[in-house]
Regions:
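P-loop (Walker A) phosphate-binding loop of NTP-binding proteins
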Residues: 62, 92, 203
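Short, locally clustered residues in the helix-turn-helix/winged-helix DNA-binding domain
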Residues: 50-51, 285
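Extended, hydrophobic alpha-helical segments in both membrane/secreted and soluble proteins
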Residues: 59, 65-67, 71, 75, ...
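Short hydrophobic/aromatic beta-strand immediately N-terminal to the Walker A/P-loop
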Residues: 57-60, 88, 198-199
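Inter-lobe coupling linker of SF2 helicases/translocases
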Residues: 128-129, 135, 139-160, 172-195, ...
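Conserved G/P- and acidic residue-centered "switch" motifs that form tight phosphate/ATP-binding loops
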Residues: 64, 166, 201
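SF2 helicase/translocase NTPase motor core
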Residues: 3-47, 54, 67-72, 76-189, ...
Length: 345
């Protein structure tokens, strides 16, 4: 009240106090600390989470529905209720900055990004007796950085109360060594029965039933032994408490009575290549065909790597002149080295 000098200031002070009291008594406390207005359907995962202890949710909504907002809402609510004091997001490297921006700008967290490029700078801010993983309360981590043996156990030792795993379909054991390492990391996190865990993906089922069961097993060990083809009604009801999946079509048809997503209009336009651009494309096509021809006789994995490299080159060349220039400059990397990079991707 020290700064109140007139009736206008007093009115603002009273309004602020009233809103603060209303917020603390409301069933959802986080609404006063976010800078985004959630859609009604985006509150469903939050309401589901408030019925669980610990919170274990697989959010498998369609692309564009807002899984990031849904997960961050849960994190903000648990934080404001005092149920968590530390938070980690595990995601692919290319999503780290996007997650940090969303948490900072829309949900008033102060995250740090932890990956191979930032860890050295972060370590300079940490007292000697602590680690990066224990010092910063809100972290966005590259899952491919943390899954490495030298980082994994230190992270697990100091893992926070809530962990969000984005693109979790990339952390199922089916699909090679890299996926298996990610799965082992998330499995170790899930083994703590007190930990809150949010799993996000738009593609929970890749067509491999065992991989889907392993994914469900991260929510509850018992789910892993359930065969989806023989689920009982009781099992479906129990799983439904932990699993939400909506398509854009589902939401557009059943929520809020107005179109939520813009209608997609498809129109094809012809594009005439200049003589120089056509010559470039034909040269790139000949090169790509030679790459595929030279892959004959190689091991299956290396052959597929070269096919993808050839297709990526052609798509880049057809995209734009600048994209073509960038792709052709990368051709200075030997194919063997490029294959190694693709395996790490």
């Amino acid at each position: 009240a020290h700064g109140i000098k007139d009736a206008g200031s007093m009115h603002l002070f009273w309004q602020a106090a009233r809103l603060l009291l209303r917020e603390n008594s409301a069933p959802i406390r986080s609404m006063g600390r976010i800078s985004v207005r959630p859609r009604t359907y985006q509150l469903v995962p939050l309401l589901m989470a408030l019925r669980l202890d610990p919170v274990r949710l697989l959010i498998a909504d369609d692309v564009g529905v807002g899984k990031t907002i849904e997960a961050a809402l849960i994190a903000r609510e648990l934080w404001d209720r005092g149920e968590i004091r530390r938070l980690a997001v595990l995601c692919p490297p290319y999503l780290c900055d996007q997650w940090a921006k969303e948490l900072s700008e829309k949900f008033h967290f102060q995250p740090v990004v932890v990956n191979s490029a930032t860890v050295g700078l972060l370590e300079r801010e940490v007292p000697h007796e602590r680690s990066v993983y224990s010092h910063f309360p809100v972290q966005v981590l590259s899952i491919d950085f943390v899954k490495r043996e030298r980082n994994k156990y230190l992270f697990l030792q100091h893992a926070p109360e809530l962990v969000i795993v984005d693109e979790v379909h990339g952390a199922t054991p089916a699909g090679g060594r890299e996926r298996h390492l990610r799965y082992e990391l998330v499995r170790a996190l899930a083994d703590d029965p007190r930990r809150h865990l949010l799993l996000l993906t738009a593609t929970p089922h890749s067509g491999v039933p065992q991989a889907f069961q392993r994914l469900l097993g991260l929510l509850d060990r018992e789910f892993e032994s359930w065969d989806p083809s023989t689920w009982t009604e009781e099992q479906r009801i129990r799983l439904a408490r932990h699993f939400v999946q909506r398509t854009r079509k589902d939401i557009a048809a059943t929520w809020e009575g107005a179109p939520l997503f813009p209608e997609r209009e498809v129109r094809y336009e012809g594009y005439h290549l200049s003589p120089e651009y056509r010559a470039l494309y034909e040269a790139a096509f000949r090169y790509a065909r030679e790459v595929v021809r030279r892959s004959e006789g190689l091991a299956e994995v290396r052959r597929r790597m070269r096919w993808w490299a050839a297709l990526t080159l052609l798509r880049s060349v057809m995209s734009s002149p600048r994209s073509a220039q960038s792709a052709l400059e990368r051709r200075g990397v030997p194919l063997e080295e490029e294959e190694a990079l693709l395996e790490l991707a």
